[in-house]
Amino acid sequence: MKKFLLTLLTAVAVTVHAADITGAGATFPYPVYAKWAEAYKKETGIGLNYQSIGSSGGIRQINNKTVTFGATDAPVSGENLDKMSQVQFPAIIGGTVPVVNLDGFKPGELRITGPVMAEVFMGSISKWNDPKLVALNPGKRLPDQPITVVHRADGSGTTFNWTDYLTTVSKEWADRVGRGAAVKWPASTSV
């Protein structure tokens, strides 16, 4: 009997040990998770397969129990965690910044405030030489060219973080658009 139990436990342990860990969600942490997965497999022999499909997709998959863990850049409410019998904890911390491609400006050289950024994303500031941008960049020559606003098209934790910030710095943004993983962008090009 003892030999049978030991054999059974060994078989279960080998089966459990052979199972890969699966995860899905936010694109932001993928490079870090890939490095961690490589180190974890080397140390334990257990694979970690992470699908970088966006925060909303990760939440859907963990809620549907098709993955071992989900990842999102946006916090999940306590109510939803309780409903799904889940826990959350921070794994990686990062920031979101606007990217500007404007001739004559080096990275970090263009000055812009949160409220003005909200106006750009709402479409009320639509040209680089808008007086509000000119006032923030004295001595710089801003072109009379349209601003093309680009954002993610899918549900995204990065979108949540960005719109959360714009909601904090602009009452008009808060009233018209608000915060969320997916919002109706007033001025945009989806990617």
Model feature map: region roles:
Residues 1-4:
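Positively charged n-region of N-terminal signal peptides that target proteins for export
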Residues 18-191:
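Flexible loop/hinge segments at secondary-structure junctions
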Residues 6-18:
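Hydrophobic h-region of N-terminal signal peptides that target proteins for export
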